[in-house]
């Protein structure tokens, strides 16, 4: 499940670190989280869509690696990001 242009722009505006930021880790994690949410709801309805399940697992792994990178750089940025996105308990 992909994001359309308006959804992407809203995510970028909400998570960018400066005015022209479109690829920072925060933006990437926010986009991945939104795609993961959409794909999870799709898979609840379509339980036998195994190729989408594989893609979901890859996205979760990528998000996990990006979050690990942020955590290593700055614990404060990491905590702010997971709180803002509501992805960890």
UniProtKB/Swiss-Prot annotation:
Give the protein's biological function. One of the primary rRNA binding proteins, it binds directly to 16S rRNA where it helps nucleate assembly of the platform of the 30S subunit by binding and bridging several RNA helices of the 16S rRNA. Forms an intersubunit bridge (bridge B4) with the 23S rRNA of the 50S subunit in the ribosome.
**Could you mention a single GO BP entry for this protein?**
translation
Biased composition annotated in UniProt, kind: Polar residues: 8-23
Write down the NCBIfam families for this protein, in alphabetical order.
Answer: S15_bact (TIGR00952)
What family does the database annotate? Belongs to the universal ribosomal protein uS15 family.
Q: Which UniProt keywords apply?
A: Ribonucleoprotein, Ribosomal protein, RNA-binding, rRNA-binding
Report the HAMAP family cross-referenced here.
Ribosomal_uS15_B
**Gene3D superfamilies listed in its UniProt record:** 6.10.250.3130, S15/NS1, RNA-binding
Protein source organism: Prochlorococcus marinus (strain MIT 9313)
Name one matching Pfam family.
Ribosomal_S15
Q: Give GO MF terms, alphabetically.
A: rRNA binding; structural constituent of ribosome
Q: Where is this region: Disordered?
A: 1-23
The molecule here is called Small ribosomal subunit protein uS15
- InterPro entries documented for this protein: Ribosomal_uS15, Ribosomal_uS15_bac-type, uS15_NS1_RNA-bd_sf
Q: How does it assemble?
A: Part of the 30S ribosomal subunit. Forms a bridge to the 50S subunit in the 70S ribosome, contacting the 23S rRNA.
**Phylogenetic lineage:** Bacteria, Bacillati, Cyanobacteriota, Cyanophyceae, Synechococcales
Q: Name one GO cellular component term.
A: cytosolic small ribosomal subunit
């Amino acid at each position: 499940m992909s994001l359309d242009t308006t959804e992407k722009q809203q995510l970028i505006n909400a998570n960018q670190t400066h005015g022209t930021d479109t690829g920072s880790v925060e933006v990437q994690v926010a986009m991945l989280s939104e795609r993961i949410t959409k794909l999870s709801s799709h898979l609840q309805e379509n339980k036998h869509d195994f190729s989408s399940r594989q893609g979901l697992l890859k996205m979760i792994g990528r998000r996990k690696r990006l979050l690990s990178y942020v955590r290593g750089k700055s614990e404060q940025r990491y905590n702010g990001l997971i709180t803002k996105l509501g992805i960890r308990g």
